[in-house]
Amino acid sequence: MNNKFFKLIFYLALLLSCTPSFGAKWKAKHVVFIGLDGWGAYSMEKANMPTVKQLMKDGSYTLEKRSVLPSSSAVNWASMFMGAGPELHGYTEWGSKTPELPSRVLSHYGIFPSIWGLFRDANPQAEIGFFCQWNGLEYLAEMKAMSKEMHVKAEDDPSGKADKAVATHSCAYIERKETSFRRHFL
């Protein structure tokens, strides 16, 4: 019995010595956050979107996210950015520019804390680009935390398409800057 026990311990120790360190943490060099407003996860299975599917395969994503109520753009984007529901951040309407309810907490940027301000505070030298098509997003993020922010319009691209303009300006920015956290919305 003792012989089997020692063999088990030996092989377990050998196995553990061959694995990477449990304490080692992988850190991404860059983070790109892409949000698509109004896109239902139910469409993914039949969608012919090889680029998006490749990004999903190589990155991190969820198809399980549910809308907060009321299900409108500003309320849901605020909830994703801020990691809290409307009862805490206070945004309750589609085009909210300021919270309809008083925010439970305010960051030093003057709005409920979000990933953008928290990331900037943790990484003061980081390059953070913020490009969006819908100008309503500008009220839901700490714009003073951004290195570059741009509300892109359809006329900003020769194609006349706003989503193409967001991609064009975002790519140009990424090529010019060594960005840490990028946010692009189509």
Give the residues covered by each predicted segment:
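Bacterial N-terminal signal peptides that target proteins for export
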Residues: 1-10
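Boundary at the C-terminal end of the N-terminal hydrophobic targeting segment
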Residues: 21-23
